[in-house]
Amino acid sequence: MKTIGLLGGMSWESTIPYYRLINEGIKQRLGGLHSAQVLLHSVDFHEIEECQRRGEWDKTGDILAEAALGLQRAGAEGIVLCTNTMHKVADAIESRCTLPFLHIADATGRAITGAGMTRVALLGTRYTMEQDFYRGRLTEQFSINCLIPEADERAKINQIIFEELCLGQFTEASRAYYAQVIARLAEQGAQGVIFGCTEIGLLVPEERSVLPVFDTAAIHAEDAVAFMLS
């Protein structure tokens, strides 16, 4: 089994399911008392979020690249960045850390393609929904077209993520709002929906979505398990 290095804490609410799902995957594959060989560097999300708001992406790239190098020195054999949004600085991490980097959009793209879909809704932070680092990768590498919510919906989705989900608050009102947005995007022709923020799966259970769900945290964790046992 390879040792996986997790870059977490963005937010820590969604890092917990990563750890659980990876261990469950290892136990399911190997049985008995087997558990995952994991190294975790959990950052202070306050600092990361402030850099996001100020547009200081180079600084966040430096922070995460240094964290990845620390995991490499500690014995990690691959890196998993436990957040969608911070894949905006994936190139900064990959350029300085020589370990295999398991990109969350690649794992998600393979899952969508495997389901025979080419047109999906994308929910996430405003950075993930509006910028090209995520949607562009899905389009260029997997020919997947992403539908995003309207501007006012994107603002509210983003607000709920940062002011509720990242603080461990999961309300029925927000759950219903996300379900409403998903239903509207289904009417526009979306075949499935990407939960493109690792906290969204903590809020919206699959049965509340009218579309098949691609929960990126679960998909990414499964990708990590496959890598560890390869």
From Swiss-Prot:
PROSITE patterns, sorted: ASP_GLU_RACEMASE_1, ASP_GLU_RACEMASE_2
Name under which the protein is recorded: L-aspartate/glutamate-specific racemase
Catalytic residue positions: T83 (proton donor), C197 (proton acceptor)
Catalytic activity field: L-glutamate = D-glutamate; L-aspartate = D-aspartate
Organism: Escherichia coli (strain B / BL21-DE3)
Keyword Isomerase belongs to the record: yes
Residues reported in the UniProt entry to bind substrate: M10, Q52, T83, N84, T85, T198, E199
Keywords: Isomerase
Family under the similarity heading: Belongs to the aspartate/glutamate racemases family.
Subunit-level organization: Homodimer.
